[in-house]
């Protein structure tokens, strides 16, 4: 049975090809261990965030280079729907190569736009946008963890 048979044609058609591909074949799913980070001369950052509204949760792993604060690698584990997996996967990809201060500027809109097939067509149906918000929130949590500050202080910056 195909995913289309399970989800139903009309709803399934509201997802971009990129979202469908990332649901089925996420590129950055996994974890970074302490020894992996050490090989990159990086600090390991692990942050968790959950969306109580739907029961989805994501754990984000960053390997942050000690001297430059550049995110050398990013991985995630996600518990939830396919949209949460796709959003988490794209979010991890967007973080790689950025400094922590640059990564915290990634918004849920950036994540959603990166999943689009066409610039003017949303990647997911409106009722699934909260998944990209969860990706945004876990980036803020990882940044706060790395900097040793309360997440609320990042909203004030």
Regions found by a protein language model. Name each.
Residues 1-28, 34, 38, 46-47, ...:
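C-terminal binding/interaction regions
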Residues 52-54, 63-132:
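Active-site- and interface-proximal helix/loop "cap" or "latch" segments in soluble metabolic
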Residues 59, 68, 91-92, 140, ...:
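Low-complexity, compositionally biased segments
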Residues 25-71:
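Structured beta-strand/loop patches that form or line metal/cofactor-binding pockets in enzymes
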């Amino acid at each position: 049975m195909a995913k289309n048979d399970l989800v139903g044609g009309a709803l399934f058609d509201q997802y971009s090809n990129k979202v469908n591909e990332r649901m089925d074949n996420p590129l950055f799913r996994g974890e970074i261990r302490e020894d992996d980070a050490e090989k990159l001369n990086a600090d390991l950052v692990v942050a968790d965030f959950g969306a109580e509204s739907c029961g989805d949760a994501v754990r984000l792993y960053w390997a942050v280079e000690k001297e430059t604060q550049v995110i050398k690698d990013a991985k995630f584990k996600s518990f939830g729907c396919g949209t949460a997996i796709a959003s988490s996967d794209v979010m991890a990809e967007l973080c790689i190569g950025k400094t922590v201060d640059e990564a915290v500027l990634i918004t849920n809109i950036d994540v959603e736009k990166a999943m689009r097939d066409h610039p003017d067509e949303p990647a997911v149906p409106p009722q699934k946008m909260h998944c990209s918000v969860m990706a945004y929130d876990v980036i803020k949590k990882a940044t706060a963890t790395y900097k040793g500050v309360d997440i609320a202080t990042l909203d004030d910056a």
